[in-house]
From Swiss-Prot:
GO MF terms, alphabetically ordered: ATP binding; glycerone kinase activity; lyase activity; triokinase activity
Record-stated family: Belongs to the dihydroxyacetone kinase (DAK) family.
Source organism: Dictyostelium discoideum (Social amoeba)
UniProt enzyme class: transferase
E.C. code: 2.7.1.28, 2.7.1.29
Residues of the active site: 247
PROSITE patterns hit by this protein: DHAK, DHAL
Cellular component, GO annotation: cytosol
Name the UniProt record assigns to this protein: Probable dihydroxyacetone kinase
Length: 648
């Protein structure tokens, strides 16, 4: 077990101290109660107070949701363990006033028991304070399994499923609880009475009474309770748990790991089996909306709040929750797939909340919560500003269509037009074929040695060099027949552009600028005094210029344990051969030149074995890079060695 903690037995109290010491908006109740409240609690006793809590390990829940327009206080049990009734009672006693107190409880036996006992204690010890409990039970997975409806694509009996679902009471409370905090917290902030808040919740939010709030999750790993020191279950690299809770327990089914699109589709398809939206056509929807508007006064009277017209039947609040250690990259991909699929199903996502909101310690995975907007006041309540540290600063308003999120620039071919000058410099068709073969040999060698370069890079870098150079090579090969190799200045510019489109880390940058400078230098040298012809000497000097471009960009030189330790001696040898040939009457011996350059590249690559890296990511490792050949230098050696297979 690796965790940044002190004593496993003190993690909760020390965590609370971390929260409260870092924010003047929070106070910790003195004593061993693990209770945290708003620092302005004494000024808001004329409003309904909201208290939530449960086991720790779900942070930022629930301390992170204490603040204006959210919770008044929170009670923390041990990790994944319910707080005691006494702790909860002390929280109520600390902050509740004449307007009463609502306890927001996730539907677990321990939490229900402790909060219910605390409420009962208040009847005799705090008789002037009305205390009510609402239970959040938004998780649908275990019920679908009991109804044998999980992964069943037959939707003919949807209403029957919903009726049975509503009658079953042992659903878990998970990430949808965060939306309950926000909406009810907003109502309390507006000064609504306890009855008004309860009626609004039961009519528009309650998972068990309205079915409007549903959640389902998927886990890619378990988690480790500090006091236990080992995971509660294990998953191999190709497995995932569907429909799990937030306490490190198994899901309802262990399945093969799927791509994000399939995971999201499975979660949403199951959520929509319960969510009471209508599949009616637009005319029916309009009729329903008219009926809803006509009955709006009845709706307002039923909840006691003037809350505006009922929302459209397929408008949603979507909450995508990080269960603990899912990367932001994965979260963004899942968000994209979620929005695309909901749009495909005809839903409008009015608000999107994403982030680490209700965790299961360090579990990898996500959950998706859908709240059907049956009243537009819900949107206003979600939008209310809060200083609660766990609520995202930005509640997002997604585009209704993906196309609306794309910036389209006017297309023109001006970038091709300005390259016409580069195309004016030509070599013979035969030499163009030789150049093409050289490029192909280099690309093929990098593709064939991808794994070797990756393994080498893992020892001193981030392990992506082999894959990067393989991808660049494949992209060049894909365009190989569209490149006019008898026009070398344009050819090298084209190769640079291909690499730029993929880039692939710093190595991609260096290869791109090499070919870009080679193109520019060849053109400038071949057009001096209007000769418009490339000499042998121009080739050598232009290659030197291209190497200098890498030196300038990387601020490196020979001896720094980089690709330059192999590239510089190889290019220097080519340049020397070009100079020697310029003063000779014999034809240029390309194969012999490449043999000499290849030998220099090999010696340069081998020289890095005894070096300590001074540049690049490897430089952060210091002496740990010693006795390991630099992967960038070895890639240059591989490229030059491939040139020896030239047939022309």
């Amino acid at each position: 077990m690796k965790k940044i903690i002190n004593n496993p037995q003190n993690v909760v109290s020390e965590m609370i101290d971390g929260f409260t010491q870092s924010s003047r908006d929070l106070l910790k109740l003195k004593g061993n109660f693990n209770v945290v409240v708003r620092s302005d609690y004494s000024q808001i006793k004329d409003r309904v107070t909201l208290i939530s809590g449960g086991g720790s390990g779900h942070e930022p829940a629930h301390i992170g949701y204490i603040g204006n327009a959210m919770l008044t206080g929170a009670v923390c049990g041990d990790v994944f363990a319910s707080p005691s009734a006494k702790q909860i009672f002390m929280a109520i006693k600390s902050v509740a006033g004449k307007m009463g107190c609502i306890l927001i409880v996730k539907n677990y036996m321990g939490d229900n028991g402790s909060f219910s006992i605390a409420r009962e204690m208040c009847k005799s010890q705090l008789p002037d304070i009305r205390v009510e409990i609402i239970t959040v039970d938004d998780d649908i997975s275990s019920i679908l399994m009991k109804l044998n409806e999980f992964s069943n694509d037959n939707n003919d009996n949807i209403q029957d499923i919903r009726d049975k679902y509503k009658s079953i009471t042992n659903r878990r409370g998970i990430a949808g609880t965060v939306l309950v905090h926000k909406i009810l917290g907003g109502l309390a902030e507006q000064g609504k009475s306890i009855d008004e808040i309860l009626k609004f919740y039961n009519k528009y939010i309650s998972p068990s009474k309205s079915l409007n709030l549903v959640t389902m999750g998927v886990g890619l790993s378990s988690c480790i309770i500090p006091s236990v020191g080992s995971p509660s279950f294990t998953l191999n690299e190709k497995e995932m748990e569907i429909g799990l809770g937030i306490h490190g327990e198994f899901g309802i089914e262990k399945v093969e790991l799927k791509p994000s699109k399939q995971i999201i589709k499975s979660l949403i398809d199951n959520l929509l089996k319960i969510l009471p939206y209508s599949n009616n056509n637009n005319n029916n929807n309009n009729n329903n909306n008219n009926n809803n508007n006509n009955n709006n006064n009845n709706n307002n009277n039923s909840c006691g709040i003037s809350c505006g017209s009922d929302g459209e039947d397929k408008s949603l609040i979507v909450l995508i929750n990080n269960l603990g250690s899912t990367t932001n990259m994965e979260m963004a991909i899942a968000t994209n797939d979620c929005l695309n699929y909901l749009h495909e199903k005809g839903f409008t996502v009015e608000r999107l909340i994403t982030g680490t909101l209700m965790t299961s310690l360090e579990m990898a995975g996500i959950s998706i919560s859908l709240l059907l907007i049956k009243n537009n006041q819900i949107i206003n309540l979600i939008d209310l500003k809060t200083n609660a540290m766990g609520w995202p600063n930005s509640v997002l308003k997604p585009y209704k269509n993906k196309e609306d999120s794309i910036l389209t620039l006017d297309e023109n071919d001006s970038h091709e037009i300005k390259y016409d000058n580069l195309k004016s410099i030509t070599i013979s068709k035969e030499n163009g074929e030789i150049l093409k073969e050289i490029v192909l040999l280099g690309c093929n060698s990098l593709i064939e040695n991808s794994n070797k370069l990756t393994d080498l890079d893992k020892q001193v870098g981030d392990g992506d060099l082999g894959t990067t150079l393989e991808n660049l090579s494949k992209s060049i090969k894909k365009s190989i027949d569209t490149i006019p190799f008898d026009k070398p200045c344009y050819t090298f510019r084209k190769i640079s552009l291909i690499i730029q489109e993929l880039i692939g880390g710093s190595s991609g940058l260096f290869y791109s600028i090499f070919f870009l400078r080679l193109s520019n230098s060849l053109y400038e040298r071949s057009t001096v005094n209007g000769k418009n012809q490339i000499s042998t000497n121009d080739w050598g000097l232009s290659l030197i210029d291209a190497v200098n471009a890498i030196k300038e960009l990387g601020k490196a030189d020979i001896g720094d344990c980089t690709m330059l330790d192999s590239l510089i001696p190889a290019i220097n040898k080519i340049n020397q051969c070009c100079k020697d040939n310029e003063n000779s009457s014999s034809s240029f011996d390309l194969l012999n030149t490449l043999k000499l350059a290849s030998k220099e590249a090999q010696l340069g690559s081998e020289s890095t074995i005894e070096m300590i890296a001074k540049k690049g990511r490897s430089s952060y490792l210091g002496e740990r890079t010693s006795h390991i050949m630099d992967p960038g230098a070895h890639a240059i050696e591989i490229i030059f060695k491939s040139f020896l297979s030239i047939k022309k």
